[in-house]
Amino acid sequence: MKYHWPLMGEIITENQRMDLAKFILSTTRYTQGPQVKEFEDQWSKWLGTKYSVFVTSGSTANYVLVAAIKERYNLKDGDKVLVPANTWVTSISPIIQNNLTPIFYDISLDNFGPDEGSIEKIKQKHSEIKFAFVTHLLGLPANLNSIKKYYPEI
């Protein structure tokens, strides 16, 4: 018996398509417009924060996050950051783009989080890690206990 499970389907209605077409034809500005500002303000209010910044993608969000951490904690070019060896390039690129040095750790096959033996070996060579960029791979929450154990200050 054959089964057919579609991987996607039509989720945008005809009315939504027409609304989008009207919007595209009504302006030449598609980013950082008044609707984005209004949404940022409402989002900030809901979060209880002073500011929010909307970006184009998760990749850009990672870049902005690393840049903000570098500025906030006065990190210097070349400072070392723990990153998983098994991740997406968009988790590593922001480290390099911000002139920081990625130090790769292995993951545990039990939970795809940091492998304790790997973190222990890294600690022996690199005591001066400034922060850890952790990927919660495949939607599984990474166990951070090994990072906390060997780098309690980060």
Task: Indicate where each model-derived feature is located.
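Alpha-helical structural signal in soluble globular domains
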Residues: 42, 52, 94, 98, ...
